[in-house]
C-alpha cells in the first residue's frame, strides 16, 4: 500500500512530463465572484495542482462539525482550524514547486504585495505566470454571498470587494496585459458557461501549451532528464 509520501514522491518524478509544468495561474476575485465555479470549468482536465487554503479550511470546518455561518461563539475553534489549513496548503505548494508542477493559486487578490512576491519567486524558478481575475459588481457579490453555504458578514464582503478592485490596475502592470484574463461574472452561471468560460478555457489551454521560454526552466528540465538516465 502506498503511503502519502510515496504518492507525493511519485508526483515529483512525474512532474517533468506534466502538461502544465512551469505554469502558474493566480486566481483573484472577492467573495461571491464565482472563482470556484470558474476553476472547475476552465481548468478541468489540465492536471494543475490547486492551492487553496479556503477549500481546506471549509472541509475542516465541516469535519469538525462547526457552522459555515461563522458565528462569533466558534471563533477560537475556527482560528485554530484556519491556521492548520494554511500550514497544510503551504506544504502542498512547497511540494508542488519542488517538482515544478503546474499551479492554480486561488486567492482573493486583496494582498497585492503577497501575490507580487509569490509571482516573482515563481518567475525566478522559471515559471510562466498568469492571472485570471473574476470580476463582479458589489451588488452581485453581496447577493451571492447571501446564497453561499459559507457566508461572511456584509461589511467583510464590501471591504474585500473594494480592496480587490483597487488592485486591478496593479495586477495588469505586474502580469502584463497578455497574461491577465478578466472575466465579467455578473451574469448567471448558465450564461457564463455558454459564452465566457469556453473562451477562458481556450486561453488557459493555449497558455499551458505555450513552449517554455525560461532558460532556468529549461536547465532544470535538462538536469532532471540527465538524472533519470543514470
Cite the ranges covered by each PLM segment.
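N-terminal pre-Walker A segment at the start of P-loop NTPase domains
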Residues: 1-16
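Phosphate-binding P-loop
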Residues: 15-22, 95-97
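Short hydrophobic/aromatic beta-strand immediately N-terminal to the Walker A/P-loop
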Residues: 24-26
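The conserved Walker
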Residues: 30-31
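Conserved substrate/cofactor phosphate-moiety recognition/catalytic segment
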Residues: 37-101, 113
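Acidic, metal-coordinating catalytic cores used for nucleic-acid/nucleotide bond scission
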Residues: 106-115
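Conserved phosphate-donor/acceptor-positioning beta-strand/loop module used by diverse small-molecule
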Residues: 123-144
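Conserved GTP-binding G-domain of TRAFAC-class P-loop NTPases and closely related GTPase folds
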Residues: 138-230
Amino acid at each position: 500500500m502506498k503511503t502519502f509520501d510515496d504518492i507525493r514522491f511519485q508526483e515529483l518524478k512525474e512532474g517533468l512530463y506534466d502538461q502544465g509544468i512551469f505554469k502558474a495561474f493566480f486566481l483573484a476575485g472577492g467573495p461571491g465572484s464565482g472563482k470556484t465555479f470558474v476553476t472547475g470549468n476552465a481548468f478541468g482536465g489540465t492536471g494543475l495542482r490547486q492551492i487553496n487554503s479556503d477549500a481546506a479550511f471549509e472541509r475542516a470546518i465541516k469535519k469538525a462539525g462547526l457552522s459555515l455561518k461563522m458565528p462569533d461563539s466558534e471563533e477560537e475553534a475556527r482560528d485554530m482550524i484556519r491556521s492548520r489549513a494554511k500550514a497544510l496548503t503551504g506544504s502542498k505548494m512547497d511540494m508542488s514547486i519542488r517538482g515544478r508542477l503546474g499551479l492554480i493559486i486561488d486567492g482573493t487578490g486583496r494582498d497585492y504585495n503577497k501575490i507580487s512576491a509569490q509571482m516573482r519567486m515563481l518567475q525566478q524558478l522559471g515559471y510562466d505566470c498568469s492571472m485570471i481575475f473574476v470580476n463582479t459588481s458589489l451588488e452581485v457579490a453581496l447577493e451571492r454571498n447571501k446564497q453561499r453555504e459559507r457566508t461572511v458578514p456584509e461589511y467583510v464582503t464590501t471591504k474585500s470587494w473594494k480592496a480587490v478592485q483597487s488592485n486591478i490596475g496593479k495586477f495588469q502592470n505586474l502580469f502584463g496585459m497578455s497574461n491577465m484574463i478578466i472575466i465579467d461574472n455578473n451574469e448567471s452561471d448558465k450564461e457564463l458557461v455558454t459564452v465566457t468560460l469556453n473562451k477562458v478555457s481556450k486561453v488557459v489551454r493555449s497558455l499551458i501549451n505555450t513552449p517554455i521560454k525560461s532558460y532556468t526552466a529549461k536547465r532544470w528540465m535538462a538536469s532532471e532528464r540527465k538524472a533519470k538516465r543514470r
